Amino acid sequence: QRQMCIRDRDMGDLRVIPAEIGGGFGGKTTVYLEPLALKLSEKSGRPVKMIMSREEFFRATGPAPGTVNTVKIGCKKDGTITAMSAKLIYESGAYPASPLGPGCMCVFAPYDVENIHIEGFEVVVNKPRVAAYRAPGAPQSVYAAESVLDELAEILDIDPLDFRIKNAATKGTQSAYG
């Protein structure tokens, strides 16, 4: 859309037939060669077909971010969670653009806990830029939190599913980020 606006063209002038099916999950958010295809179509006055092989697609993207996550959870003996804390460190590659925000939003989202503290840090490193895949940023942070919940359930001798249900967010629960 942005490319069409820049060129003062109507969206109706553009026809896109995506070959991939399913949701975006982050992988379809990146603009690859579309601006080039649009310019070639303008210059030639003909439709331009853009096809990327799987190899080209993977070369055009980047890796998911490396992360270092620290999660602390406090609870009563009956399994009521009293506090949750997370320190999330996400690599962004050579340029700032990691999915740290969604990681912070999702880390404790399923739970109704009054005391939550989340710190997030994005670190620029000498690696390729990261790309979005499969719920960008969420799997890394959620895996850390859910692993700690499993450990706590074992220590408390509570069924892990019952432990989660006991502390689950319900309609009207305010998220940690507001």
At which residue positions do the language-model features occur?
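Structural alpha/beta core scaffold segments of enzyme domains
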Residues: 3, 7-178
